[in-house]
């Protein structure tokens, strides 16, 4: 409930309050998803989900920042707080917040295609998220090739990176 309430005021604020709100939405959302994982699937699943998703996200984001693959040439600003291996700590928790509901939905509707549904859903979430975060200066890309339609500041390779990493996760 707290994560939802925080999101309701999101369009009404700016500046430092918005920066702190952004971070809190992610942590509270991740906490809600972990609580759901615990209550719906048990302790073992919740702990496995937490650690696997956290380390996968931290690893793929670190690779992305350092090598420009698979998301393109990007960097995070200092606005998102403490960084681990050039990745803000809040970023793996954003993956935790989104991957669990995607996995839960995919298992219910996608049958043997869970991996594809998961990749598409996470890429779609990123298409929603990136324009806001770029506009707020949370991260930036150097775009040298094709870009996301109507979003010249976001390379198309980022969407494919999310599709690929989402399918793998």
Give each language-model segment a name.
Residues 1-169:
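Aromatic-rich, lipid-facing transmembrane alpha helices and their immediate juxtamembrane interface loops
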């Amino acid at each position: 409930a707290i994560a939802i309430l925080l999101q309701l005021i999101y369009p009404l604020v700016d500046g430092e309050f918005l920066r702190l709100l952004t971070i809190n939405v992610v942590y509270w959302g991740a906490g809600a998803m972990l609580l759901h994982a615990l209550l719906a699937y048990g302790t073992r699943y919740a702990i496995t989900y937490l650690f696997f998703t956290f380390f996968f996200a931290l690893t793929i984001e670190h690779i992305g920042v350092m090598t420009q693959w698979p998301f393109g040439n990007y960097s995070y600003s200092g606005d998102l707080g403490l960084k681990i291996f050039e990745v803000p700590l809040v970023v793996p928790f954003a993956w935790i917040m989104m991957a669990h509901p995607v996995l839960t939905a995919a298992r219910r509707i996608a049958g043997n295609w869970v991996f594809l549904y998961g990749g598409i859903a996470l890429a779609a979430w990123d298409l929603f998220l990136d324009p806001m975060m770029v506009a707020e200066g949370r991260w930036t890309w150097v775009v040298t090739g094709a870009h996301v339609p109507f979003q010249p500041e976001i390379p198309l390779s980022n969407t494919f990176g999310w599709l690929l990493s989402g399918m793998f996760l």
